[in-house]
Curated annotation (Swiss-Prot):
It catalyses: RNA(n) + ATP = RNA(n)-3'-adenine ribonucleotide + diphosphate. GO terms for molecular function: poly(A) RNA polymerase activity. Cytoplasmic non-canonical poly(A) RNA polymerase that catalyzes the transfer of one adenosine molecule from an ATP to an mRNA poly(A) tail bearing a 3'-OH terminal group and participates in the cytoplasmic polyadenylation. Polyadenylates mRNA encoding extracellular matrix constituents and other genes crucial for bone mineralization and during osteoblast mineralization, mainly focuses on ER-targeted mRNAs. It holds the Pfam family NTP_transf_7. PANTHER family: PRION-LIKE- Q/N-RICH -DOMAIN-BEARING PROTEIN PROTEIN 44, TERMINAL NUCLEOTIDYLTRANSFERASE 5A. One of its GO terms (cellular component) is cytoplasm. It is an enzyme of class 2 (transferase). It comes from the Eukaryota. Its EC number is 2.7.7.19. This is Terminal nucleotidyltransferase 5A. Expressed in primary osteoblasts derived from neonatal calvaria and osteocytes. Strongly expressed in calvaria and femur. Keywords: Cytoplasm, Transferase. The lineage of its organism: Eukaryota, Metazoa, Chordata, Craniata, Vertebrata.
Length: 447
């Protein structure tokens, strides 16, 4: 058997045979020629020590700038844990639960898209999960698993193909014994899809398919051709390129170690990677071009405040005004505002119900202080809505706030329904402030 050794000082190793780490670099030991196989960059010990978070990625990043950085071994392990974890996708009604591994769904979806003629440039982990990989103790936590497929979506046909492919892939994850013949794409959509979004205009071309999980850990598959604004704040601007790790899963016969693992690139679409990473570690709120942030940015901003993040400077007051204005542009109707707030509370506070009240009071304070685009009655209407939701949260938790700040709601007596009776007084809703964490077993007097 003819063996050849390929030395790489940049970590380029051809898969197709056996591999070993040796000395200050890597040897690839192949049974045949090294040419013709897939190539993957390897991280590890290029100079006698383990890879550090400060390694530059000029040899691997598409645009070698300060936007990119190489993940260290600890971060690679966290990423591997996320992609290898089995996540249940819960079906509605009598549909069975799907056991879905992120790395596997990415592999299946990508392969079928390419079979249909839709090229996938790369796949990335995005959002809070990417931030968690980079810094585990950031305080952000993560729920949704946001996976981005950078794909070519030229027209309506490609968007429809993406939808069909994802729904068809779900059939592969149904438990054995399930009769798949009569299950239609529409049935799968109703059973397993939390939401679908399609945006197609001059600046943005992307679609989102969110697979539902009862604990809020949805798997979100996002297919992006172009997207003008990819982040809201620096701490959620991170994306991790998964291609080298996915190729390692597919090709390597040996497990990863500290000295033998693929080189994985992290990128900050905010700008300077180290600046954004410093914001993440020190819980700093910063952004660029705040006028581009959509209406949901206000809700994310208040969530960061509740989690202990603080503005980078006093100029954040201007940012608050931008975000309030945009929120009321995107959600101008009080009904839309209520649906958006209720949805946000439901999706972002799973297991954190005790923080909902503080969150709503923080939102109340920001809206009260920084809203300049509304008529007085519209502003009061929104503030009253936030207060009502806060009181509902307290009721759900069986907690009563400080007596001096309680708003009383009266149930009308039966005779009030009489058309001739008009002496009923509706109490004005007042803001609720910091909750004194006590419970009371009796009714309290009203001020």
């Amino acid at each position: 058997m003819h063996q050849r050794y390929f030395w790489t000082d940049q970590g380029q190793v051809a898969f197709g045979g056996h591999y070993m780490a040796e000395g200050e670099g890597y040897f690839a030991m192949a049974e045949d020629e090294l040419t013709g196989g897939p190539y993957i960059p390897l991280g590890g010990d290029f100079g006698g020590g383990g890879s550090s978070f400060g390694d530059r990625c000029s040899d691997y990043c598409e645009s070698p700038t300060a936007h990119c950085n190489v993940l260290n071994w600890e971060q690679v392990q966290r990423l591997d844990g996320i992609l290898s974890e089995t996540i249940p996708i819960h079906g509605r009604g009598n549909f069975p639960t799907l056991e879905l591994q992120p790395s596997l769904i990415v592999k299946v979806v990508r392969r079928r898209l390419e079979e249909k003629g839709i090229g996938v440039r790369d796949v990335r982990l995005n959002g809070s999960a990417a931030s968690h990989v980079l810094h585990q103790d950031s305080g952000l936590g993560y729920k949704d698993l946001d996976l981005i497929f950078c794909a070519d979506l030229r027209g309506e046909e490609e968007f429809q193909t993406v939808k069909d492919v994802v729904l068809d892939c779900l059939l592969d994850f149904l438990p054995e014994g399930v009769n798949k013949e009569k299950i239609t794409p529409l049935t799968l959509k109703e059973a397993y899809v939390q939401k679908m979004v399609k945006v197609c205009n001059d600046s943005d071309r992307w679609s989102l398919i969110s697979l539902s999980n009862n604990s809020g850990k949805n798997v979100e598959l996002k297919f992006v051709d172009s997207l003008r604004r990819q982040f809201e704040f620096s701490v959620d601007s991170f994306q991790i390129k998964l291609d080298s790790l996915l190729l390692f899963y597919e090709c390597s016969e040996n497990p990863m170690t500290e000295t033998f693992h693929p080189t994985i690139i992290g990128e900050s679409v905010y700008g300077d990677f180290h600046e954004a990473f410093d914001h993440l570690c020190n819980k700093i709120i910063a952004t660029r071009n705040p006028e581009e942030i959509r209406g949901g940015g206000l809700l994310k901003y208040c969530n960061l405040l509740v989690r202990g993040f603080r503005p980078a400077s006093e100029e954040i007051k201007t940012l608050q005004r931008y975000m309030c204005s945009r929120f009321f542009i995107d959600f101008s109707d009080i009904g839309e505002q209520q649906r958006k707030l209720e949805s946000y509370l439901q999706n972002h506070f799973v297991g954190l119900e005790d923080r909902k009240y503080d969150y709503l009071m923080t939102l109340h304070g920001v809206v009260n202080e920084s809203t300049v685009c509304l008529m007085g009655h519209e502003r009061r209407q929104t503030l009253n809505l936030i207060t009502m939701l806060a009181i509902r949260v307290l009721a759900d938790q069986n907690v009563i706030p400080n007596v001096a700040n309680v708003t009383c709601y009266y149930q009308p007596a039966p005779y009030v329904a009489d058309a001739n009776f008009s002496n009923y007084y509706i109490a004005q809703v007042q803001p609720v402030f910091t909750c004194q964490q006590q419970t009371y077993s009796t009714w309290l007097p009203c001020n």
